[in-house]
Amino acid sequence: EKHCFDADGHMYFEVTENGTPLRKRRYVFSECFAVIAMSEYAIASGDKTYAEKALALFKRIQRFLSTPGFLEPKYLPALQARGHSITMILINTASRVRAAISDPILDTQIDESLAAIRKYFIHPEFKALLEMVGKDGEFIDTCNGRVINPGHCIETSWFILEEARYRDWDKDLVRTALQILDWSWEWGWDKEYGGIINFRDCRNFPAQDYSQDMKFWWPQTEAVIATLYAYQATHDEKYLAMHKQISDWTYAHF
């Protein structure tokens, strides 16, 4: 709070050990993670002032995202695109705030993000959830448009399953989450060496990112969580086996 917010309310991405600002970015992911931290602190400590701060910052995030020109566009106007990342993280962010404090905007945001994932990012023709699509969800046949990020997709299935649990295991949400999880596991699991790899191309071309075949820790841990949620939702032994498979691999390597 003391060192990481600029005068415009946007967070710095990087500061020195003394709090001197070094870098700002065009995203609001730092704000989302700050909101989650404030919410969890409020729940753990009982200090409701942090729940109120979390809600206020969440509303600020929404204002940043809806104010034309406040956040620098990733692409020039020739490319009108939507990104999966912010759509997905807002589900979890709103969910964590809701656990600390009530406000109708939280349910509204979750519903809007869920609808956007279903409408724009799920592409059955590739059996994949894509990271970047056109403004109306159309497939963009470029290196970036073909990217599948199995970790992000599995994380999304976790968030949707968590919301399904909140809604007494809503069947439609469970169905959507399991579809994403099953597809993403198929794309991401390394059948030879185990673990979830970073990136795939939905047309099976070589993925552009240099780290495409690496296995960072976070896709593994999110797969551990998502598969356990899937088992809780369905009691299907398949998901328990997947949970054991990714858990064994993760704890053996990290």
Located regions from the model:
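Glycan-recognition and catalytic cores of secretory/periplasmic carbohydrate-active enzymes
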Residues: 1-254
